[in-house]
A protein has these predicted regions:
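Binding-cleft/active-site segments that stabilize strongly anionic ligands or cofactors
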Residues: 1-108, 112, 120-134
Length: 136
């Protein structure tokens, strides 16, 4: 199961709210910051570069509340090159309109988007494993 950091905002970096964390788990992922997900207000879910580096997410999903997620800005953060998601290129966007508003869209479209990202990650891992096995 991939560890997922869901970034709701970039400056300051804010991790995902509770229902997003639940959708990550339902989709087959592991929430990178489960303790923060239970906190309702955004200021209580602020994380630092060091927090994200220590969490070592396999996938980073950005949903920057109405502005476009820019993977390059995430990749340029100090120390982020050592994070598996950044090293392996697993930075994805989910539009905030389908994930950050509680209700039917989050439960259908938002969940489906997370499931697709998790499935892509699993397929990539399986292909890498098969390639490694073929070399031995």
């Amino acid at each position: 199961r991939p560890r997922i950091y869901f970034e709701e905002w970039d400056e300051p970096m804010i991790s995902g709210i509770g229902w997003v964390s639940e959708l990550i788990e339902i989709a087959g992922g592991v929430e990178a910051f489960p303790d923060l997900a239970t906190r309702k207000s955004a200021p209580e879910r602020i994380v630092t570069n060091e927090d994200v580096i220590a969490a070592r997410p396999d996938i980073i999903i950005g949903s920057w509340c109405g502005k476009k997620f820019v993977p390059g800005r995430v990749q340029e953060r100090p120390g982020f090159g050592q994070i598996p998601a950044v090293r392996d290129g697993f930075l994805r966007e989910i539009k905030s309109t389908i994930i950050l508003q509680p209700g039917p869209a989050a439960l259908t479209d938002g969940l489906a988007a997370i499931e697709a990202i998790v499935a892509e990650w699993l397929e990539t891992r399986a292909a890498a494993g098969a390639a490694t096995a073929a070399q031995t």
